[in-house]
C-alpha cells in the first residue's frame, strides 16, 4: 500500500507499509513519544500482520507511524501511533489513522479500539476529533503505573 496525501495542515506526505530498514527511525520517533519502546515487539507485530504497520514519509524520511493489531475476537486495535516531534500538530497522525481505518474497513472490521494514557490529553483530543469515544478506564495499565482510557470508534 502506498498513497500520497496532503495533511489538513498542508504537509505533503507519503503513507506506505513499514519495511524492516525503517525500524531505526521508528524507534527514534518512539523514544520521542513514549516511555518504553521495544524494537523486537514492533518487528514481531509486523511479522504477524504486515498490512497493519504503516509509516508516513516526507522527502524520503519517516516522520510518523501507526501500528494496528487484530485481536482473536476480530477487533481492530491501534497499538501505537507516533509522529516526529517536529511534525506534531500538522495532521500527520490524523492522516495515518485514516489510512489505518481504510485497511480495517477493507477487512470488514467495523470498529477499532485503543488505550491512551490519562496524562496524554493531546492524543485524547486527536482521538475524539477522529470519532473515538471513551468506553472505560484501566488503572495501572502502563509499566510506570499510569492508567489508560479505553476508547472505541465505529468504522
What are the functions of these language-model segments?
Residues 78, 112-116:
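Conserved hydrophobic beta-strand within the GNAT/NAT acetyltransferase core sheet
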Residues 83, 117-118:
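Short amphipathic helical patch at the helix-1/turn junction of helix-turn-helix
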Residues 89-102, 125-129:
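Conserved acetyl-CoA-binding loop-helix of GNAT-fold acetyltransferases
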Residues 93, 97, 120-123, 140-145:
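Short glycine/proline-centered loop/turn elements that form peptide/ligand docking sites
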Residues 15, 89, 116:
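Conserved SAM-binding loop
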Residues 6-13, 17-86, 97-99, 103, ...:
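Acetyl-CoA-dependent GNAT
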Residues 115, 128, 133-149:
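Conserved catalytic-core motifs of GNAT/GCN5-like acyltransferases
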Amino acid at each position: 500500500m502506498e498513497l500520497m496525501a496532503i495533511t489538513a495542515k498542508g504537509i505533503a506526505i507519503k503513507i506506505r507499509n513499514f519495511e524492516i530498514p525503517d525500524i531505526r527511525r521508528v524507534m527514534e520517533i518512539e523514544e520521542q513519544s513514549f516511555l518504553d519502546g521495544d524494537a523486537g515487539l514492533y518487528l514481531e507485530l509486523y511479522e504477524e500482520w504486515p498490512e497493519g504497520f504503516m509509516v508516513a514519509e516526507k522527502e524520503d524520511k519517516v516522520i510518523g507511524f501507526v501500528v494496528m493489531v487484530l485481536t482473536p475476537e476480530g477487533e481492530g486495535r491501534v497499538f501505537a501511533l507516533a509522529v516526529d516531534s517536529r511534525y506534531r500538530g500538522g495532521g500527520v497522525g490524523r492522516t495515518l489513522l485514516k489510512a489505518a481505518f481504510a485497511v480495517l474497513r477493507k477487512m470488514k472490521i467495523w470498529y477499532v479500539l485503543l488505550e491512551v494514557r490519562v496524562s496524554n490529553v493531546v492524543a485524547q483530543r486527536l482521538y475524539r476529533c477522529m470519532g473515538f469515544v471513551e468506553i472505560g478506564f484501566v488503572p495501572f495499565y502502563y509499566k510506570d503505573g499510569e492508567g489508560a482510557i479505553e476508547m472505541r470508534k465505529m468504522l
